[in-house]
Amino acid sequence: MSEMDKVQEKPSQTTKTEVQAKLPKVGVLLVNLGTPDGTSYGPMRRYLAEFLSDRRVIEWPRLIWYPILYGIVLNTRPKRSGKLYDRIWNREKNESPLRTYTRAQGEKLATALADYPNVVVDWAMRYGQPSIESVTDRLLQQGCERIVMFPLYPQYSATTTATVNDKFFEALMKKRFQPAVRIVPSYETEPVYIEALARSIEKHLETLSFKPEVVLASYHGIPKSYSDKGDPYRQQCLETSRLLQARLGLDDSQFRSTFQSRFGPEEWLQPYTDETVEELAKHGVKSMAVLNPGFVADCLETVDEIGNEAAEEFLENGGESFSHIPCLNDSEDGMKVIETLVRRELQGWV
């Protein structure tokens, strides 16, 4: 090889090294609803104030809503909600199950994506800590030039997915440098999600000493007026249920869909979970199992509202056997859903 050939070869090697060194870091941000830091009055009030002040959650005019919120709700509800949270509190970690599971989901996803050396995984809450803004800052400080943000809601609603998007972009609005962004969309019909739900139901039913006459899919409700204005949430929930029912091979008498957690005087999406549970028991149904397809992790609304309150209502009205089917949480099937959707959005960036 001549000296001229060596000189010509060297720049191409340098260029390749430089290109490899400049592979941008990509952040993956998992976001769930949120949780109070404790069950006492102070932490509960701070959490509820942030949550119930969100215009996406309560659409009433502020002149009407704020006097109710600050004059009544925040003086009475923190104590009552604190007692409910205390029933499900993770004593070992001194936190709610939602925070425990969301952290575990983040850690397991990071391990699963270890084959991508330029990917950084973190997690945040829309309300409470760690906040979306603080974790976004952390990702940027670590050199992330691109971020995949994943609102952990299978079905889209302005009250959940949209407000997470709002807060994320609000954080970016303050930045001089803004990373490229991808948002993981709702996944109410994704085969990997439907299969994970079906497998979780089948595995749970195998552990029971009874065969439920009814499997009830209970989704968090929203005011009917929101749906009437175009929120696609109800349709997406029912589509999830349709696919899940078909996968399980259950008929309409064996599988029902309902909506829970209504708040305030407005009409919410129906049928209501509590009324349906009571009605089924009074009409002779002796055994049932309830799952929450719209929640990726167990929380107050699943563990207590269904596992305790709905169970009591069913048994008090003539039912004999009741079981709550846990959410996917950080199970193998649940993590497969999250990993599959994140890997799809990472294409072209890793």
Curated annotation (Swiss-Prot):
InterPro entries the record matches: Ferrochelatase (IPR001015), Ferrochelatase_AS (IPR019772), Ferrochelatase_C (IPR033644), Ferrochelatase_N (IPR033659)
- Any idea which GO molecular function terms this record carries? ferrochelatase activity; metal ion binding
Instruction: State whether keyword ATP-binding applies.
Output: no
- Protein residues bound to Fe cation: H220, E301
Q: What class of enzyme is it?
A: lyase
Specify the pathway.
Answer: Porphyrin-containing compound metabolism; protoheme biosynthesis; protoheme from protoporphyrin-IX: step 1/1
For this record, an example GO cellular component is: cytoplasm
Q: What does this protein do?
A: Catalyzes the ferrous insertion into protoporphyrin IX.
**What is this protein called in UniProt?**
Ferrochelatase
